[in-house]
Amino acid sequence: METKNEEWVEIFKDMIPRDNYKIKVLLTNLADEQEIRLIGEKNRFKFSCFCYDEARFFSRELYLSAILDKEMFKKFEKDNFQNVIYEVKNSQLVRKLEYTSYYDPGTLHSQHYIIITQDSVVEILVSANSDLSISQY
């Protein structure tokens, strides 16, 4: 299970109000930045960075019932996963990719984020050379 021994840290907590967000668009325009847009009933946000190393999409139901470690699920379910985005420390996915990459082991250094909305879960790996930013649109 990929979430075993990982630590999820809430990020952008004070910037993103509670809402029923859905992921509407994933833009991959490398000339500018890559964006994941969230549309809520009252709010709209976009997460952007220069380049994602990896992006994986899941239905929320599948991710929360079959992929997420049960202990992690219990920890965050009490708030109905309202934070929307978490940075994953000690990411096993990053470690797996480091060992299977063409780089020397330990040199990939991606940051792992999980975005949970009402209908989807997106896991993204952002290159350590690129920062994930948030803005309203």
Predicted regions and their residues:
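Surface-exposed, interaction-prone regions used to assemble/regulate multi-protein complexes
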Residues: M1-Y137
